[in-house]
């Protein structure tokens, strides 16, 4: 990734509800309001549900950037300091709570990613074996395609994979409209 400066860490990680959030939301909704998830760090803070402590090591792509180490236990305090990092990017280290160790098991992680991140627009990789595995999610799901570009077999495969049903659906309706609101999806009718 492009990493963050200390100021960006303060703004986007430390201050979830920074003073301009309401103004930003209002402007964002006027501009279409798509993709608001991920803009306030709420997803990041949900990591504290299973972690007792989280560290961020980051270095911005900007010229003369220095590394930043941020750490917090999720309460009201945190530490932030410079650190030595050779490359730009961000690494997040979650120290999993003792009673949440099941979330360190490959099968559990894989299952959660496939269930909750199946159609994220960015590829998600899980590397337990030391080699590059294929992405666990589909960054271009079938419902984003134009109906004319989809085959019957693709519709059936997507249904079986998404709904874990080995039967073919009875029929389906591919929704792709822009007015009076934007809607893309596939409505399946099981047998």
What residues fall within each predicted segment?
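GHKL/Bergerat-fold ATPase module in large chromosome/replication-associated machines
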Residues: 36, 54-77, 97-100, 107-191
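GHKL (Bergerat-fold) ATPase N-terminal catalytic module, capturing the glycine-rich phosphate-binding loop
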Residues: 1-98, 102-103, 111
């Amino acid at each position: 990734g492009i990493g963050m400066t200390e100021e960006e860490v303060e703004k986007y990680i430390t201050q979830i509800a920074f003073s301009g959030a309401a103004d930003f939301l209002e402007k964002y909704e006027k501009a279409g309001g798509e993709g608001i998830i991920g803009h306030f760090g709420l997803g990041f803070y949900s990591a504290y549900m299973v972690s007792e402590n989280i560290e961020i090591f980051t270095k911005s792509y900007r010229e003369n950037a220095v590394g930043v180490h941020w750490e917090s236990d999720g309460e009201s305090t945190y530490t932030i300091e410079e650190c030595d990092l050779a490359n730009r990017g961000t690494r997040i280290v979650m120290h999993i709570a003792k009673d949440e160790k099941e979330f360190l098991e490959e099968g559990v992680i894989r299952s959660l990613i496939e269930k909750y991140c199946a159609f994220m627009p960015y590829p998600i990789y899980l590397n337990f074996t030391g080699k590059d595995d294929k992405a666990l999610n589909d960054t271009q799901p079938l419902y984003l395609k134009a109906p004319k570009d989809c085959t019957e077999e693709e519709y059936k495969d997507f249904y079986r994979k998404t709904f874990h049903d080995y039967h073919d659906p009875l029929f389906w309706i591919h929704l792709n409209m822009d007015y009076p609101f934007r809607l893309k999806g596939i409505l399946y009718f099981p047998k």
